């Protein structure tokens, strides 16, 4: 179950369509009400849909409320605010997994200093290991056509930093497959995939075969309750 805790984001990534919805954050009492409603159906929740969850000023209280009602929490973040929020995340027993969308660095036109961006994330991950938090690094920026030389170089720079951090004796590209993750350390994974395309009623009709998990084994509740 996905629960959007804010519709606001601090980046403007090329792969993420802008929202026309009003800026909003989820109040604690609204989360508690939602958790009571979904409790018979799941014990795992994802505190994100659109927006950057670490912009929520009381994300620590949301985690505490989730734990009080017996839920395990996964969070997906662009990672830019991890230093500011580390004290709100570490030591929270509800927090099961954090996914870092590393492709957001190159997806946002104004990004600067890749080394510091990744360094802050890796510094957090080192401490998160002591709390048995699962970490997933995501690079969902592969193109189905020929990848540009610039995109290849940018990805290689990111992967080199990860290879050095975890003392890997291989290049990650040699083992990773689109849509499948690889384990690079205890509780630490890397997932590389094609760029995610957000569904749109304005997009060209796709006659290909596919399968949608929505409302079968997953659902999302937006910050306004819809």
Predicted regions and their residues:
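Surface-exposed cleft-lining segments at the edges of enzyme active sites
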Residues: 105-112, 199-204
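Conserved strand-turn element in the central/C-terminal portion of the radical SAM core barrel
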Residues: 73, 105-107, 124-155
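A structural motif corresponding to the C-terminal lobe/cap of the Radical SAM core domain
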Residues: 120-130, 208-212
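A structural signal for short, well-ordered beta-strand segments and their strand-loop junctions
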Residues: 74-76, 99, 134-139, 171, ...
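Structural recognition of alpha->loop->beta junctions
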Residues: 39, 86-107, 150-182
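Class I S-adenosyl-L-methionine
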Residues: 54, 140, 165, 169-171, ...
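Conserved alpha-helical substructure of the radical SAM core
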Residues: 1-98, 108-119
């Amino acid at each position: 179950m996905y629960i959007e805790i804010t519709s606001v984001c601090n980046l403007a990534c090329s792969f993420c369509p802008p929202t026309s919805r009003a800026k909003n954050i989820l109040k604690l009492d609204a989360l508690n009400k939602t958790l009571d409603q979904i409790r018979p159906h799941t014990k795992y929740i994802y505190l994100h849909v659109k927006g950057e969850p670490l912009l929520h000023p009381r994300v620590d209280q949301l985690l505490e409320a989730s734990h009080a009602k017996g839920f395990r929490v996964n969070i997906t973040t662009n990672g830019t605010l991890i230093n500011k929020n580390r004290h709100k995340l570490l030591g929270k027993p509800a927090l099961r997994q954090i996914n870092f969308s590393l492709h957001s660095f190159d997806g946002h036109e104004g990004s600067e200093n890749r080394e510091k961006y990744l360094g802050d994330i890796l510094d957090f991950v080192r401490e998160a290991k002591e709390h048995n938090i699962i970490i997933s690094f995501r690079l969902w920026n592969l193109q189905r056509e020929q990848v540009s030389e610039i995109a290849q170089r940018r990805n290689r720079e990111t992967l080199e930093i990860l290879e050095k951090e975890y003392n890997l004796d291989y290049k990650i590209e040699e083992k990773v497959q689109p849509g499948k993750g690889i384990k690079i350390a205890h509780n630490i994974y890397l997932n590389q995939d094609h760029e995610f395309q957000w569904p749109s009623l304005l997009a060209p009709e796709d006659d290909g075969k596919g399968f949608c998990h929505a409302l079968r084994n997953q659902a999302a509740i937006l910050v306004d309750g819809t």
